[in-house]
Amino acid sequence: MEFGIFHEFLTTQAGSQAEAFRNSFAQIEAAEEWGLDVVWLAEIHMNPTRSLLTAPLTVAAAIAARTHRIKIGTAVQILPLGHPLRLAEETATIDQISGGRLIFGVGRSALDRKSVV
């Protein structure tokens, strides 16, 4: 059995976006230190009062550079919003950077279709 955390990179009332990113990265680094196996990243668009996580693959690359063991999963990457070749190249690159720790989860999203740009 594996244990992990689901992270949305929540915004904070009291701080800047940079502070919210720093806090989230610190939580993930702590999760690795505590022995958790995986961090799952959401993809959340058009909701800046809730989450900063609009680019989970970019964040996954940053996590890969900051950690050594914890697996990094997308839960979920919204396929209709990305070009297939670009997604394939980015995921392959992050998997190499992370030493094979990327778990690429895809889905349709919970976005209202009217809100998709």
Where do the protein language model's features map onto the residues?
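The substrate-binding groove and active-site-proximal loops of carbohydrate-active enzymes
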Residues: 73-80
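Structural motif
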Residues: 42, 75, 105-107
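N-terminal beta1-alpha1-beta2 module of alpha/beta enzyme domains
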Residues: 1-66, 70-71
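Flexible, glycine-rich active-site loops centered on histidine and acidic residues
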Residues: 2-19, 80-117
